[in-house]
Amino acid sequence: MAVSKVYARSVYDSRGNPTVEVELTTEKGVFRSIVPSGASTGVHEALEMRDEDKSKWMGKGVMNAVNNVNNVIAAAFVKANLDVKDQKAVDDFLLSLDGTANKSKLGANAILGVSMAAARAAAAEKNVPLYQHLADLSKSKTSPYVLPVPFLNVLNGGSHAGGALALQEFMIAPTGAKTFAEAMRIGSEVYHNLKSLTKKRYGASAGNVGDEGGVAPNIQTAEEALDLIVDAIKAAGHDGKVKIGLDCASSEFFKDGKYDLDFKNPESDKSKWLTGVELADMYHSLMKRYPIVSIEDPFAEDDWEAWSHFFKTAGIQIVADDLTVTNPARIATAIEKKAADALLLKVNQIGTLSESIKAAQDSFAANWGVMVSHRSGETEDTFIADLVVGLRTGQIKTGAPARSERLAKLNQLLRIEEELGDKAVYAGENFHHGDKL
């Protein structure tokens, strides 16, 4: 079915920063998508185009990307008369219009908006839910469909918070639930208990939440944070049903070849900085004491040696985010160096749906897991909820069970589970290999 109109506008994300919304019109209606935005902009990522005009939006405007959709992509896209059901053709067309390796001519935020809107239009044309269309595109098995374990970011440290705590995200994963709906209830109950305990121990303002909905108390060490979470799990009555995931974001505290766990202190003691081996030992001691099942970015993005050393003995899921930035060449290197065994998939890091699907397929082929992820600057768009079901990855990271831009995805997964009924299973303990269920 032909596309009669492509139109973009600037809207706002959950941090109050501009982002790109694209509308694509066919005979079936108007199909919309909003692009998320990350705080990180790694050198190996597709380029998120910002206007850099400091007199407006602190330089973060997206009018250039919006104009690229309206003045460059729109007319060419309509004229090309593409079949929106052929996502590869749509994305190849967008890539050829851009012509750069990192999408810097048109902007990954312009290209991705069109790519996602096209997928929504295609699902409508086929009269199927978006997740089913995405399963068709990725040639995923659909009997049964797999609902993911939500890795809920309930406590923040690192650059996302005050306090000395170096590690960035502490997540709870209700793997012991029987359904996604039960997982959400467990997650919600643990979250509320965590907020109460945090206020009790650190004062009322410690219950305030960060960009992704997690609490950010003035905590000094990882042990202190983990004790708080374990106490909240017990207080909620869900001991044994809830595991823990970490996102260390350790590129943030990598200095001169070592890791500074006191990086927020300008006077930090250099004699206490850790080598990669010493940091690995610290992770091992945490894994012995706490029910940790997944660690993301345990080392800096180019410290390959430390990644490979740790992976040999970790025995739990090791997720590559900064290491791979959803970039096929980086993923291939990580697979070859045996540095990790799971990919964090962020569609806007690579910039088209087809490339995102391929990144997941390459990872599955290497026996890796795939965790679909939001970004810190999110919107009400729920695309990744359908994507995680369509790709059958078994795990999603989309913030805390709080803040509407996070709940939008989690609520969409509740709807999908309800709609699928007995045609779906919850990944539970098998989150690492949802693709094999």
Curated annotation (Swiss-Prot):
> Which reactions are catalysed by this chain?
(2R)-2-phosphoglycerate = phosphoenolpyruvate + H2O
Tell me which UniProt keywords the record has, alphabetically: Cytoplasm, Glycolysis, Isopeptide bond, Lyase, Magnesium, Metal-binding, Phosphoprotein, Ubl conjugation
GO MF term set: magnesium ion binding; melatonin binding; phosphopyruvate hydratase activity
Q: What is its EC number?
A: 4.2.1.11
Q: What is its EC class?
A: lyase
Cellular compartments per GO CC: cytoplasmic side of plasma membrane; cytosol; fungal-type vacuole; mitochondrion; phosphopyruvate hydratase complex; plasma membrane
- According to its UniProt record, where is this protein mainly located? cytoplasm
Kindly state what the record says about how the cofactor is bound. Mg(2+) is required for catalysis and for stabilizing the dimer.
Q: Which residues carry this modification: Phosphoserine?
A: 138, 188
Q: Which InterPro entries match?
A: Enolase, Enolase-like_C_sf, Enolase-like_N, Enolase_C, Enolase_CS, Enolase_N
Q: Where in the cell is it found?
A: Cytoplasm
Q: Which NCBIfam families match?
A: eno
HAMAP family with a match to the protein in the record: Enolase (MF_00318)
Q: What is this protein called?
A: Enolase 2
Please report the organism this UniProt entry assigns to the protein. Answer: Saccharomyces cerevisiae (strain ATCC 204508 / S288c)
**Source taxonomy:** Eukaryota, Fungi, Dikarya, Ascomycota, Saccharomycotina
